[in-house]
């Protein structure tokens, strides 16, 4: 929040994936930051048409909220949220939020490449104190790779079970997103 200036909005727009597309802003109060992002315009229009009073929350905000309880005031914490062929990777150093981005991840070598670049950019040598991860389906090679970056690996998953209507949705029952408040 200290660095954010309303008059600089045009400058922030230049860093977006599609500078010509409108960007959204959300405040993440516990981190005291303003986050800017873009979403799929057609998909968002579709959802707004179906649910005109709905409030849309970017997934990265939910990921950071769920990680919050695992972030100590001292030490380095790396977080990874796996989703199909991508991973959201975030970093906290001594309780301070430092980094969040989404990367295309096809193999554990891709995962290593991005993590090691983050380590290099933030001066992390060896291992972090803790690695958090969450996924509906995480390839075991990814989990094994994460173990090489910390002695403490924590899976963020739902603390209460969800009701499943069919066997296919059983895997989704452990998603930590189930713990978040729902619309009624």
What is the predicted function of each stretch?
Residues 1-69, 161-163:
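Active-site neighborhood for divalent-cation/phosphate handling
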Residues 27-28, 70-73, 165-184:
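Short, surface-exposed amphipathic charged segments that create phosphate/polyanion-binding patches used
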Residues 35, 77, 103:
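Conserved aromatic-histidine-acidic binding/catalytic patches
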Residues 37-38, 81-83, 132-138:
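Structural motif
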Residues 56-57, 79, 155:
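A structural signal for short, well-ordered beta-strand segments and their strand-loop junctions
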Residues 70-96:
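Gly/Thr-rich phosphate-binding beta-strand-loop-beta motif of the actin/hexokinase/Hsp70
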Residues 97-101:
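Short small-residue beta-strand/loop micro-motif enriched in glycine and branched aliphatics
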Residues 102-178:
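Accessory, usually C-terminal, subdomains that scaffold auxiliary metal cofactors
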């Amino acid at each position: 929040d200290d660095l954010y200036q309303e008059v600089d909005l045009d400058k922030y727009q230049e860093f977006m994936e599609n500078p010509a597309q409108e960007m959204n802003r959300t405040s993440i109060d516990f981190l005291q930051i303003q986050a800017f992002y873009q979403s799929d315009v057609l998909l968002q229009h579709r959802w707004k048409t179906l649910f005109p009073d709905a409030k849309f929350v970017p997934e990265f905000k939910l990921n950071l909220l769920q990680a919050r309880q695992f972030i100590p005031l001292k030490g380095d914490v790396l977080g990874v949220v796996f989703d199909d062929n991508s991973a959201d990777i975030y970093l906290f150093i001594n309780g301070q939020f430092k980094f969040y981005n989404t990367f295309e991840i096809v193999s554990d070598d891709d995962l290593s490449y991005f993590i090691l670049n983050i380590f290099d950019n933030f001066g992390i040598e060896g291992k972090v104190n803790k690695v958090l991860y969450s996924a509906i389906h995480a390839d075991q090679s990814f989990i094994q790779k994460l173990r090489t970056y910390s002695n403490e690996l924590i899976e963020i998953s739902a603390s209460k079970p969800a009701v499943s209507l069919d066997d296919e949705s059983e895997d989704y029952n452990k998603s930590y997103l189930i713990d978040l408040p729902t619309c009624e």
